C-alpha cells in the first residue's frame, strides 16, 4: 500500500516547486513525513477574546474580533508601511505591516469581520500591533480559538510568506490528506504497557492540540519514541560488540603494580581514585573488553589512575598505549609518567609526528618485539606503520577530539581487542553521557587531592583595569606567572571586543620589565609549541593567548588567569580555561573581565562561574542554558543526532526510563528474531537512513 507521507512536499496544496525549494534548503523538509515531524516550538492559548478598551501595551498577546475601518499607506522607502485602523466598537487600534503591502490590500477588506492576534505596543500614544495574524471571524477553528502552534522559521521563508502561520496552514493541509491513521512505529505491547497515545493521535495533537492534557500526552509519546530508539540503537550495538569481542582477562596484579603502589606512589590516593581503580580492575578481570569513560576535573588525578591501569596490563604480559590530541599534551603525559615511574624497570616511549629518522625506526622496531612497554603518542600511533607485540590497554585522552573510527583503529592493532579507557576533563552531565557515550561504562573522579586551595573566581568590569594590573604586578613580583586570554586574534569591524594583537602590545607596554609569550591558533605548530615551552620553562612571565591553551598546558607556577570579554565565552569553555590555574600549592585567582552591557543569560553564566568550581554542576547548568551542543563548543545548541522533540536537559528521567525499557528488549531478544519485535528493527534501519548521525552516538 502506498504511504502518502512519502509524497514530495511540492505536491502539497499551498507549496508548489518554488516554496518546496525554500523548505528543502531552509528546514531540510522534502516529504510530507518531514513536514509532519517538524514540531512547534511553543503554543499560545488563544481561547480568550479581549475588547480594545481592556488592553495595554504591556500585555504579551491580545486577540480581538472586529473590522478594519480603513487602510492608509505612510512613509517612504524603508519607512513605508501599511496601517489598518481596526475597531471592535469599544475603541480603535492600528494594525501595521512593513512588507507585502500589495498582497495585503488585495486579501484583506474593510468592513469585514476578522479575528486579530498579536503583540501590542505603544507608538505615538496609540496602541498598535505589527504584522498580526488575521483570520476571517467565520473561520473559528482550533488554531484561532484554542492552543495555537508556533513554528521556527527563517528570514528567507518569511519573505516568501512562509511564516509560522503559513506553516500552520501547510500542516492542516497535510493532516487533511491522511485518510488512514498513521502506521504505528512501536509494537502494540509497548504502546499498551507504557500507556502511550497512538502515533496518529500524537502527530495530530502535537500540531493542533484540542486541550493542554492531550498536548502533554502527545509530547510524552513522541519523546518516549525518540529517546527509546536512540537508546535501543546504542544498547544493541554495545551488546553485539560484547558478544563478538570477548576481551582479554587480566586477573593478575603483580610486581610492577605493587612496586609502584608501595614505593613510587607520590601521595595517598583519594577515595574517588580508589573507587575508579576498583571498577577498572573488575572490568579487566571480567573476560569482556573494557570500554569505560573516565570523567574528572582538571587536577583530579586521572593520569595517575590511567597509569595504574596500564601497569595492570604490563603485569599480565601486555603493552599499553596512551593517545592524546596534541603534541604538547602527549609530551606532558610522557614527562609525568616517566617521573611517576622513576627508578622502575619500565620502558616508556613518546611517538609523535615530530619524531623522525632512526629514533622513530627504533621505537617502531621495539614496539613489535615488546621491548617498549608503554607508548605515549598523538594521532601518529594510528598510522599503519605502528604495530605492537601484544597491545592490551589503550588510554584515550580527551575523547571528543577523536572519532569512533579512530578508536576502532587502535583496536585493530591487536588480534584480540584491547581494553579501552577514555579520559575527559570536560564534565559531561549524566544524561548527556548516557546518550553520547551509551556504549561506554562511566566512572567519575569527583574529588580533588587534599591540600589543593580552591581557585578564587572574581568578576569585574573593565573600568577597573588599573587595580587589575596592580594585582598582576604583585603576583609577578612574588615569582608567579600570568595568563591573559582574548576571544579574538585581530580586531573585528563587526564587534567591539578586545583582541589578542592589540592586547599583546598593551601588555608589553604596561609590563616593560616582563617577558611576554603570545600564542594563538593561526600560528605554525612549531612556533606555537616554542612559545608555550618558553612559558612552561618560566622564561616568560605572562602568556597572552586565545583559547588554544584550554587543553594541554600544565604550569603549576601560573597563579592568575584573566579572561578578557568573558561574556563572549560559554560555560564549558570557561571551565576548561579555569583548569589551567590552581595546579600548584599557591592561591590562584581567575578574573572575568566584562563590559557593563550584559544580557540576562550572560549574567547567569558569570554568576555560575563565580559561585562554583564544580565541573558537573557547571555542565548541568550549561546543558539547561544552551542545549547539549557540541562538546568542543563550536556548535552552540542541539546534538549530533538532531533530537526533534526530546530535551536531554529536561527529560533526563524519561531517558533513564526508556533506557531500561530498551535494555530489557535487547536482553530478551539479543539476536532480534522475535516476530513481535520486527517493527523495532525495521524502524531502526529506517532511522539509520535518515540524517541522524548514529555513528556519533555509538
What kind of feature is each model-predicted range?
Residues 74-264:
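Upstream accessory/linker segments immediately N-terminal to the RecA-like ATPase cores of bacterial MutS
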Residues 38-70:
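OB-fold nucleic-acid-binding modules
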Residues 275-278, 286-607:
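Inter-lobe coupling/hinge segments of SF2-like helicase ATPases
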Residues 128-139, 393, 409-410, 422, ...:
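N-terminal cationic and glycine-rich segments that engage phosphates or anionic surfaces
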Residues 267-277:
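N-terminal pre-Walker A segment at the start of P-loop NTPase domains
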Residues 67, 119-120, 233, 566, ...:
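Short, surface-exposed secondary-structure boundary micro-motifs
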Residues 513, 532-542, 549-556, 561-564, ...:
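Accessory helical-bundle/CTD segments and flexible terminal tails appended to RecA-like ATPase motors
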Amino acid at each position: 500500500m502506498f504511504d502518502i507521507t512519502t509524497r514530495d512536499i511540492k505536491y502539497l496544496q499551498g507549496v508548489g516547486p518554488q516554496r518546496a525549494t525554500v523548505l528543502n534548503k531552509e528546514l531540510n523538509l522534502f516529504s510530507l513525513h518531514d513536514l509532519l515531524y517538524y514540531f512547534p516550538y511553543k503554543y499560545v492559548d488563544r481561547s480568550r477574546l479581549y475588547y480594545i478598551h481592556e488592553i495595554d501595551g504591556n500585555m504579551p498577546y491580545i486577540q480581538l474580533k472586529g473590522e478594519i475601518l480603513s487602510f492608509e499607506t505612510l512613509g517612504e522607502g524603508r519607512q513605508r508601511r501599511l496601517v489598518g485602523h481596526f475597531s471592535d466598537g469599544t475603541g480603535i487600534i492600528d494594525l501595521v505591516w512593513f512588507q507585502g503591502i500589495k498582497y495585503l490590500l488585495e486579501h484583506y477588506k474593510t468592513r469585514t469581520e476578522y479575528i486579530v492576534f498579536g503583540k501590542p505596543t505603544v507608538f505615538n500614544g496609540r496602541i498598535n500591533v505589527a504584522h498580526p495574524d488575521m483570520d476571517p471571524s467565520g473561520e473559528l477553528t482550533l488554531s484561532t480559538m484554542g492552543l495555537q502552534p508556533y513554528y521556527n522559521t527563517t528570514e528567507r521563508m518569511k519573505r516568501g510568506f512562509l511564516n509560522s502561520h503559513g506553516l500552520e496552514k501547510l500542516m492542516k493541509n497535510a493532516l487533511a490528506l491522511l485518510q488512514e491513521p498513521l502506521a504505528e512505529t512501536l509494537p502494540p505491547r509497548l504502546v499498551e504497557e507504557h500507556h502511550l497515545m497512538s502515533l496518529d493521535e500524537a502527530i495530530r495533537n502535537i500540531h493542533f492540540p484540542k486541550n493542554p492534557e492531550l498536548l502533554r500526552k502527545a509530547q510524552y509519546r513522541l519523546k518516549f519514541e525518540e529517546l527509546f530508539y536512540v537508546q535501543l540503537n546504542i544498547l544493541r550495538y554495545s551488546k553485539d560488540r560484547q558478544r563478538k569481542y570477548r576481551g582479554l582477562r587480566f586477573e593478575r596484579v603483580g610486581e610492577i603494580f605493587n612496586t609502584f603502589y608501595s614505593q613510587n606512589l607520590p601521595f595517598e590516593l583519594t577515595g574517588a581514585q580508589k573507587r575508579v581503580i576498583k571498577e577498572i580492575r573488575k572490568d579487566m578481570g571480567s573476560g569482556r573488553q573494557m570500554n569505560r569513560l573516565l570523567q574528572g576535573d582538571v587536577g583530579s588525578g586521572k593520569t595517575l589512575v590511567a597509569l595504574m591501569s596500564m601497569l595492570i596490563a604490563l603485569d599480565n604480559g601486555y603493552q599499553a598505549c596512551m593517545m592524546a590530541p596534541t603534541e604538547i599534551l602527549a609530551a606532558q603525559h610522557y614527562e609525568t609518567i616517566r617521573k611517576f615511574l622513576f627508578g622502575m624497570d619500565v620502558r616508556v616511549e613518546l611517538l609523535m609526528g615530530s619524531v623522525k629518522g632512526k629514533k622513530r625506526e627504533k621505537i617502531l622496531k621495539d614496539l613489535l618485539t615488546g621491548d617498549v612497554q608503554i607508548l605515549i603518542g598523538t594521532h601518529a600511533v594510528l598510522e599503519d606503520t605502528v604495530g605492537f607485540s601484544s597491545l592490551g590497554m589503550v588510554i584515550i585522552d580527551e575523547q571528543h577530539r577523536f572519532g569512533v573510527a579512530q578508536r576502532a583503529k587502535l583496536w585493530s592493532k591487536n588480534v584480540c581487542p584491547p581494553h579501552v579507557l577514555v579520559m575527559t576533563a570536560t564534565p559531561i552531565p549524566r544524561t548527556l553521557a548516557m546518550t553520547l557515550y551509551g556504549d561506554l561504562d562511566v566512572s567519575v573522579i569527583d574529588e580533588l587531592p587534599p591540600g589543593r586551595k580552591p581557585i578564587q573566581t572574581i568578576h569585574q568590569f573593565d573600568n577597573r583595569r588599573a587595580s587589575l594590573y596592580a594585582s598582576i604586578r604583585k603576583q609577578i613580583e612574588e615569582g608567579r606567572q600570568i595568563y591573559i586570554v582574548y576571544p579574538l586574534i585581530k580586531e573585528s569591524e563587526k564587534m567591539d571586543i578586545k583582541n589578542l594583537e592589540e592586547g599583546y602590545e598593551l601588555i608589553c607596554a604596561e609590563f616593560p620589565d616582563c617577558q611576554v609569550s603570545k600564542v594563538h591558533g593561526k600560528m605554525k605548530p612549531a612556533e606555537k609549541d616554542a612559545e608555550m615551552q618558553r612559558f612552561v620553562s618560566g622564561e616568560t612571565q605572562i602568556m597572552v593567548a586565545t583559547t588554544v591553551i584550554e587543553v594541554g598546558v600544565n604550569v603549576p607556577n601560573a597563579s592568575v588567569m584573566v579572561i578578557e570579554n568573558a561574556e563572549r565565552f560559554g560555560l564549558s569553555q570557561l571551565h576548561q580555561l579555569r583548569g589551567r590555574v590552581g595546579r600548584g600549592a599557591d592561591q590562584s585567582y581567575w578574573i572575568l573581565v566584562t563590559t557593563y552591557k550584559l544580557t540576562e543569560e550572560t549574567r547567569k553564566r558569570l554568576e555560575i562561574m563565580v559561585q562554583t568550581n564544580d565541573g558537573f554542576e557547571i555542565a548541568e547548568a550549561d546543558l539547561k542554558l544552551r542545549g547539549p551542543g557540541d562538546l568542543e563548543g563550536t556548535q552552540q545548541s542541539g546534538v549530533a543526532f538532531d533530537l526533534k522533540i526530546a530535551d536531554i536537559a529536561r527529560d533526563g528521567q524519561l531517558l533513564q526510563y526508556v533506557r531500561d525499557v530498551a535494555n530489557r528488549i535487547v536482553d530478551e531478544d539479543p539476536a532480534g528474531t522475535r516476530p513481535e519485535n520486527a517493527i523495532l528493527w525495521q524502524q531502526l534501519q529506517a532511522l539509520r537512513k535518515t540524517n541522524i548521525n548514529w555513528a556519533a552516538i555509538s
